[in-house]
């Protein structure tokens, strides 16, 4: 019997309980950088620093790169033109490390998280209406 697809729209929560969360403005800028970096990976081909080239790897890579300082050296090394860029984020050193502290389950955190743990422990459910999705939201499909 064929099961219908259920789209779960989620927003990435790359924070752990002991880390400093991003405020609303920082979250919006993070989202903009996250989308731009992910788009560039699809447009240009994968960066040599995107080691695990699967969907979860793209999320981890884009989140990590979005939290970095996007100076001319970073732009050049990523092959990203300096036009049409989101504004730079002002972050603390702790905030810049958020994507190195994925919730891996069982009270553990680290720089790597599997796809299932990305969904279960590092995403926030928003809804099932695809019309609610914003750039940077992740859509998961449950094929039952």
How does the language model describe each region?
Residues 43, 60-71, 141:
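Sec-exported extracytoplasmic/periplasmic mature domains
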Residues 83-144:
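...with weaker cross-activation on analogous glycine-rich loops/strands in unrelated enzymes
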Residues 1-4:
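Positively charged n-region of N-terminal signal peptides that target proteins for export
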Residues 71-81:
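Short acidic alpha-helical/loop segments enriched in Asp/Glu that coordinate divalent cations
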Residues 12-17:
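N-terminal signal peptide c-region/cleavage motif recognized by signal peptidases
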Residues 41-50, 123-127:
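Second-shell loop/turn segments in exported
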């Amino acid at each position: 019997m064929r099961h219908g697809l259920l789209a779960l729209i989620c927003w990435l929560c790359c924070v752990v309980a002991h880390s400093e969360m991003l405020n609303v403005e920082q979250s919006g800028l993070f989202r903009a950088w996250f989308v731009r970096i992910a788009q560039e990976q699809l447009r240009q081909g994968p960066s040599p620093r995107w080691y695990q080239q699967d969907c979860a790897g793209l999320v981890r890579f884009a989140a990590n790169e979005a939290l970095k300082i996007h100076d001319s050296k970073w732009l050049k090394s990523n092959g990203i033109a300096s036009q049409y860029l989101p504004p730079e984020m002002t972050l603390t050193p702790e905030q810049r490390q958020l994507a190195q502290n994925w919730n891996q389950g069982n009270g553990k955190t680290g720089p790597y998280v599997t796809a299932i743990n990305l969904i279960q422990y590092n995403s926030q459910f928003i809804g099932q209406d695809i019309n609610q999705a914003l750039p940077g939201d992740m859509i998961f499909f449950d094929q039952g």
